[in-house]
Amino acid sequence: MTASSTSPTEPDSARPSVTVRYWAAAKSAAGVAEESFSGTTAGEVLAAARAAHSKTPRFGQVLDVCSYLVGEQPVGLKDPSTVQVTDGDVLEVLPPFAGG
């Protein structure tokens, strides 16, 4: 068995490539507006994003309070690891906004 040579920031061509788009505080913590990761669920994609930004503790803290959209559909109270993603999907990362 060999280890994959794909880094967390490089999509794996055998798995769906998902664009993660950050808004407001999430964008500030990530240092970029968007980036692509591989995964078959929103949970896998978010785990890859966390790994890519593991040296920025604030990034994980912001993700912990965010809401998510996949393909313009709210993830809501679903566990992100149960939300399937497909190649070309956009996962929006939305921090809480002032006023609720």
Residue spans for each PLM region:
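Ubiquitin-like/PB1-type beta-grasp interaction modules and other compact soluble beta-rich domains
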Residues: 1-99
